[in-house]
Regions:
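Glycine-rich oxoanion-binding loops at beta->alpha junctions
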Residues: 91-112, 135-171
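Extended, charge-enriched "interface" segments that sit outside catalytic cores
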Residues: 2-114
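Conserved beta-strand elements of the Class I
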Residues: 119-123, 171, 201, 293
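Active-site phosphate/pyrophosphate-binding segments
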Residues: 187, 194-326
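A glycine- and small-aliphatic-rich helix-loop capping segment at beta-alpha/alpha-beta transitions
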Residues: 130-145, 164-166, 189-195, 214-220
Length: 326
């Protein structure tokens, strides 16, 4: 594919032209249930020939071998020479560093849960907020009665969300990978005036920066700097789930991610991950449909569309390819 075709960086002798895939009556009927989730692509009328060619394309370009390499920790971010480490947090037996980070976070979550507080005020933006928000609404009972989430730097937001609170009876969580995100730091300082650092916890990969800022050492919850922000819900960033629902539910969430990884690694072209990719490429590259609609009918999943939007657009909207070319 060329860069004009949505930046698909794969080589192939196959001729992916729309005229080759006009027989939509002879389409695949992919319906599969995995771990309680139903996947039904039958109504998309993806031609069998396109599906066959897409499988060949994946095999020619060793897509599954490349994913296995990323999963195993090979360098995927060539620009910064970094691995993609969010997989480690959800593995059954992660490397010691990631296991220690999860265990430390769970220890802190247990300590916080036993404190007497009225509200948790959570400061974060982008992936540091969208993931925890989705998990909170989906998995935590009465989430918004227990948590105030602040994600911008508009004083109107601070006033509306915190003016009625007794800040001395609040726990403050600052979620920022770099701990230098302007919106997050400015909003935290606007609300607290830096007066409640003993009841403030920083979830960050910048431990030195947190110490310099004044966060007590015991209140700094680290996670790996190679974990991308949009994938950070698998890291200690999701401490809210552990605080309010406990270790068992948090580990159950990680286990679900692990099962999805294993399904792709083991079932390959039969996995929902592969088939949803086939669906997207067919709609985007062949039919030239540039809009994806996500309807979340379940109230608890009302923030899924926002999370999925950032996840896909930030992942696929890069202007630099893997060879560092614009």
């Amino acid at each position: 594919y060329s860069k004009e075709n949505y930046g698909i960086l794969m080589n192939s002798e196959l001729n992916f032209e729309k005229n080759n895939y006009m027989d939509r009556e002879n389409s695949i009927e992919y319906v599969r249930k995995i771990h309680g989730i139903n996947f039904d692509l039958s109504n998309h009328k993806i031609p069998k020939k396109f599906h066959e060619d897409f499988e060949k394309l994946a095999q020619e370009n060793r897509i599954f071998e490349k994913f296995q390499g990323i999963y195993n920790g090979e360098k995927a971010n060539r620009t910064e020479n970094k691995s993609v480490t969010h997989f480690e947090y959800r593995k059954k037996d992660p490397h010691k560093k990631f296991k220690d980070e999860i265990n430390f976070m769970l220890q802190k979550a247990d300590q916080i849960s036993k404190k007497s507080f009225d509200k948790i005020i959570f400061f974060g933006i982008g992936g540091s907020q969208l993931g925890p928000l989705l998990l909170g609404e989906a998995l935590i009972s009465n989430f918004h009665e227990k948590v105030v989430m602040i994600t911008g730097s508009d004083p109107e937001e601070f006033s509306e969300k915190t003016s009625y609170l007794n800040l001395e009876k609040c726990i403050f969580l600052v979620a920022s990978k770099s701990l230098s995100t302007m919106e997050t730091i400015n909003s935290f300082e606007a609300v607290t005036n830096k007066n409640f650092l003993k009841s403030t916890y920083a979830i960050t990969s910048n431990v030195d920066g947190a110490l310099e800022y004044g966060i007590p050492q015991e209140n700094i919850i680290p996670f790996d700097r190679s974990t991308g922000g949009r994938f950070s819900c698998w890291s200690p960033i999701s401490i809210l789930l552990a605080i309010l629902e406990g270790e068992k539910k948090y580990r159950s969430f990680l286990e679900g991610g692990m099962k999805a990884d294993h399904d792709l690694l083991e079932n390959k072209t039969l996995s929902p991950s592969f088939m949803l990719s086939c669906q997207d490429i067919y709609n985007n590259n062949i039919l030239k449909n540039q809009t994806t609609l996500i309807l979340n009918y379940d109230w608890k999943l009302r923030s899924f569309s926002k999370y999925a939007q950032q996840l896909e657009m930030e992942s696929n909207g890069k202007s630099i390819d893997q060879n560092n070319q614009a």
